Curated annotation (Swiss-Prot):
Originating organism: Bacillus cereus
Residues in the signal sequence: 1-31
Organism phylogeny: Bacteria, Bacillati, Bacillota, Bacilli, Bacillales
EC number annotated for this UniProt entry: 4.6.1.13
Superkingdom of the organism of origin: Bacteria
Protein name as annotated: 1-phosphatidylinositol phosphodiesterase
Catalytic activity entry: a 1,2-diacyl-sn-glycero-3-phospho-(1D-myo-inositol) = 1D-myo-inositol 1,2-cyclic phosphate + a 1,2-diacyl-sn-glycerol
Record-linked InterPro entries: PI-PLC_domain, PLC-like_Pdiesterase_TIM-brl, PLipase_C_PInositol-sp_X_dom
C-alpha cells in the first residue's frame, strides 16, 4: 500500500514539474517571439503595450524626409538627405517624418528644403502615410510640420490656416494632445507642430525651436522635450552632441514625461566630401555602434539622414532594438 502511495506521489510531483517546465518554456517562447517582432521593420510597434507614451519609445525618423526626388547633382550635394521614397522609409522602420512645406498660389502645400522645391506635395505624403497605416494598423506616423519658405505670391490664406482647413481635417490625424500614448496613436498620424499660428488642438503643440542648438522646452502643458538639432557645427562637435543627448536619454530612461529628440544630420558644405551623404556614411554607423555597445533601455527619437541598408550596423535597427525593455514577459 505504501509503495502505491509513493508511486502516486511521484507521479503527481512529476506531472507538476513537467507542467511548470512547459509553462516556463512557453512563456520564454512568447517573450522571445514578442522581442523578435521588433525585427519586423514594417510592424515593429506591434508588441509594445498600448499604455506606453510615444515619448518613452525609441523611434527612428528621417530628416528632410521629402528630398528623394532631387536629380540635379548640385542640388543633391546641397539639399538631398534621403534617397528612397516615403514608403521605403516607413517599411524600414521610420515613424517620424520631417516635413517642410511652402504655401503655393493655388493654396496647396508643397515640400521644400530651404528654397529648393522637392517635387513632392503634402498630399502625397499624407496619402502614403494613410496607405501604410491601413496596411500596418499597429503603427503610428509622427509628422513634424514646418513652414520652410515664404508663401508664393497669390496665396490667399496663411500657411497654418491652409494646413488646418485643408489637410488637418482628415480623420487620419490624431486630435488629442497631452503625453500621447501608443494605444491612442495606432493607425493615426500624430502632428508635431513646428509652425506658428495654429488654431486647432492635436498632437504636440506650442513648440519653441531655436536654431542650431540643444535645448529643453515644454509642450502640451506637461511634457518636457529636449532637442539636439545642431547642424552647422564641426563633425566632432556634432557627434559629441548626439552622444551627450543620448547619454542623458539613457540616464532618464524611466521618465515617461520627458521626450528626447536627437538629430544626427549635418548640413552640407557644398562638396561631395562634406555633403549630407558623406557625413551620414560615418555618423550613422558610429552612432549605431554606440547604441549597440551601451545596450540601453531607451535612446529617444533619433532623426537621421539617408535611411538605407548600406552602412552596418544600421542606425534605425539599433534604435528600434532599444525597445526590447518595453516588451513584457
Amino acid at each position: 500500500m505504501s509503495n502505491k502511495k509513493l508511486i502516486l506521489k511521484l507521479f503527481i510531483c512529476s506531472t507538476i514539474f513537467i507542467t511548470f517546465v512547459f509553462a516556463l518554456h512557453d512563456k520564454r517562447v512568447v517573450a522571445a517571439s514578442s522581442v523578435n517582432e521588433l525585427e519586423n521593420w514594417s510592424k515593429w510597434m506591434q508588441p509594445i503595450p498600448d499604455s506606453i507614451p510615444l515619448a518613452r519609445i525609441s523611434i527612428p525618423g528621417t530628416h528632410d524626409s521629402g528630398t528623394f526626388k532631387l536629380q540635379n547633382p548640385i542640388k543633391q550635394v546641397w539639399g538631398m538627405t534621403q534617397e528612397y521614397d516615403f514608403r521605403y522609409q516607413m517599411d524600414h522602420g521610420a515613424r517620424i517624418f520631417d516635413i517642410r512645406g511652402r504655401l503655393t498660389d493655388d493654396n496647396t502645400i508643397v515640400l521644400h528644403h530651404g528654397p529648393l522645391y522637392l517635387y513632392v506635395t503634402l498630399h502625397e505624403f499624407i496619402n502614403e502615410a494613410k496607405q501604410f497605416l491601413k496596411d500596418n494598423p499597429s503603427e503610428t506616423i509622427i509628422m513634424s510640420l514646418k513652414k520652410e519658405y515664404e508663401d508664393m505670391k497669390g496665396a490667399e490664406d496663411s500657411f497654418s490656416s491652409t494646413f488646418e482647413k485643408k489637410y488637418f481635417v482628415d480623420p487620419i490625424f490624431l486630435k488629442t494632445e497631452g503625453n500621447i500614448k501608443l494605444g491612442d496613436a495606432r493607425g493615426k498620424i500624430v502632428l508635431l507642430k513646428r509652425y506658428s499660428g495654429s488654431n486647432e488642438p492635436g498632437g504636440y503643440n506650442n513648440f519653441y525651436w531655436p536654431d542650431n542648438e540643444t535645448f529643453t522646452t515644454t509642450v502640451n502643458q506637461n511634457a518636457n522635450v529636449t532637442v539636439q538639432d545642431k547642424y552647422k557645427v564641426s563633425y566632432d562637435e556634432k557627434v559629441k552632441s548626439i552622444k551627450d543627448t543620448m547619454d542623458e536619454t539613457m540616464n532618464n530612461s524611466e521618465d515617461l514625461n520627458h521626450l528626447y529628440i536627437n538629430f544626427t544630420s549635418l548640413s552640407s558644405g557644398g562638396t561631395a566630401w562634406n555633403s549630407p551623404y558623406y557625413y551620414a556614411s560615418y555618423i550613422n554607423p558610429e552612432i549605431a555602434n554606440y547604441i549597440k555597445q551601451k545596450n540601453p533601455a531607451r535612446v529617444g527619437w533619433v532623426i537621421q539622414d539617408y535611411i538605407n541598408e548600406k552602412w552596418s550596423p544600421l542606425l534605425y535597427q539599433e534604435v528600434i532594438r532599444a525597445n526590447k525593455s518595453l516588451i513584457k514577459e
